[in-house]
């Protein structure tokens, strides 16, 4: 398995676990019926924050090596930017969506929870793209 595939597999596994679990928070029926799943959903926010703060930078550093040379600045940059925006923007969206209590609030809450889940998927995709970028060599 080449380096991009090794990068893509853990990113896809984390995305497959995190994105659907977070989406369950938006549904009141799931809250009432399946409390352990809701607990996992809430814990997925912690998982996402840890992954963004530590995982992106670490994976970018490890997989950013090219031919035994120093880590690629491009991959490390993608990892750092993903970590910052993932934690900051995701936290703001989640807090805003959870704080909505006005009439029509559930709809807004569903929209923002969905946006947060989409942000998760987008940033995991960005991580995978960042892993592929340094492995592409221009044709000569």
Predicted regions and their residues:
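Alpha-helical membrane-associated segments of multi-pass integral membrane proteins
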Residues: 4-11, 99-140
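Juxtamembrane "helix-exit" motif on the non-cytosolic side of transmembrane helices
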Residues: 23-32, 93-104
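Transmembrane alpha-helix entry/boundary detector in multi-pass membrane proteins
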Residues: 4-8, 28-52, 110-120
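Haloarchaeal acidic low-complexity proteome signature biased toward cell-envelope/secretome components but also
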Residues: 1-20, 35, 65-78, 130-140
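Alpha-helical transmembrane segments of multi-pass integral membrane proteins
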Residues: 9-22, 82-90, 124
């Amino acid at each position: 398995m080449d380096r991009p595939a090794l990068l893509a597999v853990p990113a896809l596994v984390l995305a497959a676990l995190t994105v659907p679990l977070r989406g369950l928070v938006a549904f009141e029926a799931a809250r009432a019926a399946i409390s352990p799943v809701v607990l996992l959903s809430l814990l997925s926010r912690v998982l996402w924050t840890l992954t963004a703060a530590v995982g992106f930078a670490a994976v970018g550093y490890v997989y950013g090596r090219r031919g035994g040379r120093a880590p690629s600045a491009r991959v490390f940059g993608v990892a750092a930017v993903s970590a910052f925006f993932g934690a900051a923007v995701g936290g703001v969206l989640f807090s805003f969506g959870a704080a909505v209590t006005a009439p029509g609030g559930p709809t807004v809450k569903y929209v923002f929870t969905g946006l947060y889940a989409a942000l998760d998927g987008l940033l995991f995709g960005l991580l995978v793209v960042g892993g592929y970028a340094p492995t592409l060599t221009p044709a000569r």
